[in-house]
Amino acid sequence: MDYDSSDTMNGGSSNPLITKMNTMKLLYQHYLDKVTPHAKERWAVLGGLLCLFMVRITMAEGWYVICYGLGLFLLNQFLAFLTPKFDMSLQQDEENNELEAGEKSEEFRPFIRRLPEFKFWYNSIRATVISLLLSLFSIFDIPVFWPILLMYFILLFFLTMRRQIQHMIKYRYIPLDIGKKKYSHSSN
């Protein structure tokens, strides 16, 4: 076994392809880290990509299955974003129904998301870019009657959102920052 131990100890490799891949991964992670604090700009880019995708689908009049798949994926991600990490109904069963649904509790329970905001954005960006790339190839343009897909998606959206809202009302949590108290630092 004749290899340079200093390369393997430092995580490097003598193979230039692997070295280049590691450099690209570090550069990619660097840009992700730089983008992380800019939430509004990140979501604006996602909105722009989604608009571009919708224009592509509308103008090409095809790839409706890709659009439907992207819609289902984004709906699934959104529901994971709204859902608490720890299901309160399971905790209630474990506590032998000590805390009934709707009963007021003075115990502070922070809302921890099942899917954090950055991962939601990142997964959505990746899915949208992949969908845009798939819409460039005619092999993925499966002929389908799109109004059926649209009606099924709307029905699925309303049923899942109704269930999610009922869960939010039953266990009294608000997953969004809208309407919550904001405390500012007083400089006294």
From Swiss-Prot:
Membrane side Cytoplasmic: residue ranges: 1-61, 162-188
UniProt keyword Transport present: no
Compartment(s): Golgi apparatus membrane
Membrane topology field: Multi-pass membrane protein
Chain ranges on the Lumenal side, renumbered to this chain: 83-138
Chain segments annotated as transmembrane: 62-82, 139-161
GO biological process: protein retention in ER lumen; retrograde vesicle-mediated transport, Golgi to endoplasmic reticulum
Cited InterPro entries: Rer1
Assigned GO CC terms: COPI-coated vesicle; COPII-coated ER to Golgi transport vesicle; endoplasmic reticulum; fungal-type vacuole; Golgi membrane
Assigned keywords, A-Z: Golgi apparatus, Membrane, Transmembrane, Transmembrane helix
Additional remark text: Present with 2840 molecules/cell in log phase SD medium.
Annotated PANTHER family: PROTEIN RER1 (PTHR10743:SF0)
Its biological purpose: Involved in the retrieval of endoplasmic reticulum membrane proteins from the early Golgi compartment. Required for correct localization of SEC12, SEC71 and SEC63 in the endoplasmic reticulum.
Stated family: Belongs to the RER1 family.
Name of protein: Protein RER1
Gene behind this protein: RER1
